[in-house]
Each structure stands twice: as C-alpha cells, then as structure tokens.
Amino acid sequence: PTQLYLSEKKLQDIQMLYQSAETIQVDPISILAFGDCLLITDGHHRAYQALLAGRDTISAEWDRDGGDELYHLYAQACEERKIYSVLDLKNHILPQDEYEAKWYNWCDGFNQAVTLLLKRKADEIGPTNR
C-alpha cells in the first residue's frame, strides 16, 4: 500500500455497492511496479472491501500519472509502520473527518519534505554533473 489510513465512510459506500448488486462494477484500482511487488496508488478502499467480500481478484490498471518516486517513498513509510497489505489497514480505519485531517495533513507534510530533499539533492549534483 501507499496509504496509511482508510475512511470508514468510503468503506461503507463501497460495501453498499457490493450488497446492492449481483454483478459489481467498481472502477479498477491503479498500480505501479516496485521491485517484485505491485503498489496500489489509487483504490485502497476498493481493494480492502473486495478482500473482505472474499474476492481473490480485482480489476487493475497501470498508473501512468507519474510520481513513481514519490509512491515508492509512500510505500516505504507504510512498511516502516508495518503496513504491508491493505488488510494491515484494518486498525487504521477512521471517521471521515479524522481521515481527511490526518491523511491529507500527513501527505502535505511528507510531499513538502520530499520536495525539499529532492531539490537539495539536485543542488548537490550541481549543473555540471546533471
């Protein structure tokens, strides 16, 4: 995973979809290759709910939006917190307002720190070595 929390509300909305139809049509999740693993970049809630519903497959598509380096860092942050699978987010399900506050604040801070580090790294390389 590349996400630290799940929203209780989003999970409930997806669960309603699973309960309301025999043939469930949910958007595919987005993934990136990272070493020998696949990282979810979008669709953590859908993947979590699919696993809870007993599904062993889910539709996925390659994430072509860029930001691969950043997602790899997000995945490392998850691993540091012992989040190796979307099922590991079971104890990280929050009410919607708390989810938004914690997750979006964390992302903003993390992204700013990474941007500064990458800029510093580029400055150290200097224009002659680029």
Predicted segment positions?
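Basic- and aromatic-enriched surface patches that contact anionic nucleotides/nucleic acids
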Residues: 35-130
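Short alpha-helix boundary/capping and kink motifs at helix termini
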Residues: 1-41, 45, 51
